UniProtKB/Swiss-Prot annotation:
Protein name as annotated: Small ribosomal subunit protein bS21
UniProt cross-references to InterPro entries, sorted A to Z: Ribosomal_bS21, Ribosomal_bS21_sf
Keywords, in A-Z order: Ribonucleoprotein, Ribosomal protein
Gene of this entry: rpsU
Listed HAMAP family: Ribosomal_bS21
Gene Ontology, cellular component aspect: ribonucleoprotein complex; ribosome
Species per Swiss-Prot/TrEMBL record: Sulfurimonas denitrificans (strain ATCC 33889 / DSM 1251)
Family: Belongs to the bacterial ribosomal protein bS21 family.
GO terms, molecular function: structural constituent of ribosome
GO biological process, one term: translation
Length: 70
């Protein structure tokens, strides 16, 4: 669990930024959002397939974009 030690010379903004950075690094917010609603195997598979299609189309777009310059 992330936690910070408050220093005497730190103001609130700096210490809040350090705490927020630690929570982002530990993926606490994303994990909490994922656990908020139960996701079935079919939903996970569907999301994975959509993400893989999106990734493939992005690669194809980049390849075609740089192919025209050659």
């Amino acid at each position: 669990m992330p936690g910070i030690v408050l220093r005497s010379d730190d103001n609130f903004d700096a210490s809040y930024r350090r705490f927020k950075k630690q929570t982002d690094r530990n993926l606490i917010v994303t994990e909490a959002r994922a656990r908020r609603f139960h996701e079935t195997k079919t939903e996970k598979r569907k999301k994975f397939l959509i993400a893989s299609r999106k990734k493939m189309l992005k690669r194809l777009y980049m390849m075609r974009r740089y192919e025209s310059r050659l």
